[in-house]
Each structure stands twice: as C-alpha cells, then as structure tokens.
Amino acid sequence: MEGINISYFMNGAAFMFFGYVSFRLLTHRPRSRIQRILGLTLAFWALLEFKDILLYFPSLKTERLVNSLLFIDGWAVAACSFYLLELTAPGWLNWKKVFSLVSPYLAFTIAYLCTFYTPIFPFYFGFILIYSAIIVLIVTFAARRYQRYIRNNYSYSEHIDVAWLKKATFILAICLVTWVYTLSLIHISEP
C-alpha cells in the first residue's frame, strides 16, 4: 500500500472521528458546559480535517490557498486553549474572552489574505509558540491550584486527579512545536 493512501485514510478516519464525537457531544441531553465546548472544539477539528481532505485534489492545491489555510490551522491552537481554560477554570470563558483570544489569529489571517505577504509566517509561528507557552503555564498552575483545592476540601480524593492534564498539555506542546518547526522548514526552504 502506498504511503499517500495511508494519509488519505488517516485524514478520513480523523474527520469521521471528530465529526461523530462532536455530533454526539452537541446533541446529547443534558449536556454540560464543558461537553458543549469540547463538542465545538472537535467540530472545528472535523472542519480542519475536511479541509485537508479537499487539499488532496490537485486543482485545489494552489500556493496561495494552502498558505491561507495554514493560518486557519493555527486557529486550532486557540480552539484547544478554550477547552483547557474551561477545564481548569469552569465558567471563566465567555464570548468576549473567546473573541479577545481569537483576535490575534484573526488579525494575522486578515493581514495575510489582504497582502499575501509570505514573510509574515515566522511572526505567526512565533506568536503561536508564545500563546501556547502562556496557555501551558496557565493550565499547569491552574491544575496545581485545583489539586490543592481537592486535597483541602474532600476527604476521599484518590480518584479525583488532574495530573493527567499536565501530561496531556505537555504532549500537546510537543506536537505543536513539531508542527510549527515542520511548517517553518517548509517556508524557509521556499525561494
């Protein structure tokens, strides 16, 4: 089996997984606020996977379109941060905060779409790394604060643990750094 066919399959499987889970989370009643945010985050990831599937068609794969869609890919970092922030500080997230967190991504995207100026990519990738580092720090400290709260307020706290959140955030950070590094190599090697 050719490597490219595995890529098709993986994109399709990821699209179906994210789409199905987001549908289940968003249609399940009663649903909590965290389920709704996770459902919306996964719906966004399903759209990203669908976009990647469309890019397998050669007629759609132009340099400007691919570069434009890379900016939308960066929005996934913000989408994941919404879920992590809501998980560690329930009720903190509202539409005003969502807009303020998304606005830099929106500004970079609009700036690129108006100019198609490719040297903006290193600044965008740098912003994503800084934003992610700040989110990782916030989530790490919030998880510690939550752990302390559980220990101080509950007598049986053995199965109430958010240590997994720190590990998951660390793994996400590694994936993000790898993604940004790979994209920066692609854009640095272009003439």
Predicted regions and their residues:
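A cytosolic-side transmembrane-helix exit/cap motif
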Residues: 56-61, 118, 144-151
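Membrane-helix boundary/juxtamembrane motif in polytopic membrane proteins
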Residues: 147-172
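Residue-level detector of conserved catalytic or cofactor/ligand-binding positions
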Residues: 186-191
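N-terminal low-complexity or simple alpha-helical regulatory segments
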Residues: 1-110, 114, 123-126
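Extracellular-loop-to-transmembrane junctions of the mid-late helices
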Residues: 3-14, 112-142, 163, 169-172, ...
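Hydrophobic alpha-helical membrane segments
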Residues: 104-105, 166-179
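Alpha-helical transmembrane segments in multipass membrane proteins, preferentially the mid-helix core
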Residues: 21-22, 80-83, 133-153, 181
